[in-house]
């Protein structure tokens, strides 16, 4: 069974601090200490949050999540926690225990507010006959006692504090809706003992329960009105080190008066050869062993005209990776490491201020510490700059912890030409980069699950290279959930925008064909039945704009054709060709559904387009289909529709493919 079941069985309550939860880029810490006299053989911890959580059990990182969700389709995660017999990993113990959670509320999505929901139960109580995860075997209903009280669940007994260690007013990369904020973390402002069971949290507040209209019991609490289990595996992680130190140098400290909160400005400053700053042992950054010493110059203390020189270095990982940067460092309190990310160099130089201003920074506390950025980034080049380190800052390790969808490579391609094999491997690796807890158009810039990009391009590659269907199924379902009252779907479907007017209508048609292709590939009828109403609503929304020739014309929404220079004025040939393909797909889905009326309606509409297409769009003198025809003077002018004068490869290719 692959239908995504809406879960109404929660004893936990949504909690937050004592604000309205709408603050952007807010980091909130939660703790719940508890004592166990007996430890269950196994337990399950269910958890979700808006927007992203990092979960610890007894000081050990348990996991991160949930998959990026819309408020009306919120994923939750489940963690199996082994009992006292476990020899490794996070586990419960007899006596004092603590669950600690960091939640970042990004706040970019419409109708978003911060919240945390969690509960810990003995395994038999938690599952109640349901799988622990999409990949786990079902747990029999009779493996334990009936449902009882949870061990702990989010409620007013949890402790909460708004963390001052993370700056909220950091630079905002407007084109990224998933991780738009640079992270500025000051380790001096967070006591690392907060993860310990016996930490004194008496100065923290009691958590505030978020109330719904009629109840505070999920799912009766808006905006989280539908809670569903993660339907894809957890991501796999592996440690990767840079291949080369591509640059070492120093820069003169200067005040950023352009965008003072934007780290990418200082990280893009050109460097000179090292003269006064200290960079000792940079090659140690290429392994897990060794030490690299970084320090700012001190010559300015005797000669102020010199200025402060700060060390910079750039690491090349040899390929683009999706990774969390993790540092093991020690040095003087107040020293700051800035980290900039880039996919490519510009004229041989690092400059991420002009494309994607992705950067993070840590200000360290005294002594040795380990830090991991909160959000992964896509990069090949990493540039590090150090401020305020007038005694050596020691980097024991700088590692990129790659996050990857756990694909298995079931697909293969072999050719006698080496170049073709190389191209295939490049494509397969690109698909790996584009696949995480959602499918992105680019993991570097937007991290957006663009409806048309994924449906038209990416899914077929995932099937061919990996034979994987769970991620595709999640995309189809999550995209369907964005359907507006107009019948059209959202453009970016791992986020939510209430702007119903800004839709790409052709993208939605590709989604419809992707649903048909998924059925062809898997033979799974369940998702066809589940998403069929969405498909019908979409088709009816488009057909409402047909003219007397059966062609869609004067579409008020965007017909995008993915950046191509195609004229879509009036009646668009490319769009109507794509619509013909989508109507064929709709007919196939209707037959699976047993809906004879829609089968006939879709086939009839497709036939009308086919009958009119050549007569309206074919230009004999050019030997081509024109991009569009329009009545420039209006419907009642009497002049009729005329070609708009543009011809494109995209239009004529669409006519061939869908004709």
Where is each model-derived feature located?
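Extracellular/oxidizing-compartment recognition motifs
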Residues: 1-444, 453, 470-473, 491-493, ...
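Secretory-pathway/luminal and periplasmic proteins that interact with or process carbohydrate-rich
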Residues: 54-55, 107-108, 406-408, 485, ...
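A generic structural motif
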Residues: 64, 68-69, 558-559, 632
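Aromatic-rich carbohydrate-recognition surfaces in CAZymes
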Residues: 98-104, 352, 358-394, 416-423, ...
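Solvent-exposed loop and edge beta-strand segments that line ligand/cofactor-binding
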Residues: 314-317, 372, 439-451, 495-508, ...
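Beta-rich carbohydrate-recognition and catalytic domains
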Residues: 342, 474, 600, 604-607
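Short amphipathic alpha-helical coiled-coil/interface segments
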Residues: 535, 602-614
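N-terminal leader/propeptide and maturation segments of large enzyme subunits in energy/redox metabolism
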Residues: 586-598, 602
